Amino acid sequence: MLFRSDLDLEPALTTYYQKHLTDGTFVSWLAVDGERIIGTSGMSFVEKPPYYSNPTGKIGLLSSMYTHPDYRRQGIARKLLDCVVEEARACGCGAVWITASEMGVLLYTAYGFEKNGRFLQYVL
């Protein structure tokens, strides 16, 4: 089983976001149309030992990427990705990683992400 539909993640997610948005280890963006949220993106920061293609060892893990169906194919996801990449660079990350849905793979590869094992990777 890939997921449990009976599991209530809201309390754990609330705790996670309160902690990590406050301490700066998670950042998030919203795309809005008036007062309506039409897109989201988030990124966690992790550190691995430095290596040749990423001498800082810092990686941005992209998550929570979503665009409302009524607003797709209007460049919103690309603008959110621009925010992610800009923030990752500013924080000294050497790469941004994501595990993507089939629909998302097209967006990410068009943006410049490349397959790296189980992840798609954008080298900064």
Task: Name each region found by the language model.
Residues D6-L30, G42, P49:
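Active-site rim helix/loop that mediates acceptor-substrate recognition in acyltransferases
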Residues S53-P69, R118-Q121:
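Conserved acetyl-CoA binding element of GNAT-fold acetyltransferases
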Residues Y71, G75-C83:
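Conserved acetyl-CoA pyrophosphate-binding loop and the N-cap/start of the following alpha-helix
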Residues V96-L106, Q121-L124:
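Conserved beta-strand-loop-alpha-helix junction that forms the acyl-donor binding cleft
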Residues L81, A88-A100:
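Conserved GNAT acetyl-CoA-binding A-motif
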Residues L30, R36-F45, L61, Y66:
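Conserved beta-strand in the GNAT
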Residues C93, T109-F119:
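Conserved acetyl-CoA-binding loop of GNAT-fold acetyltransferases
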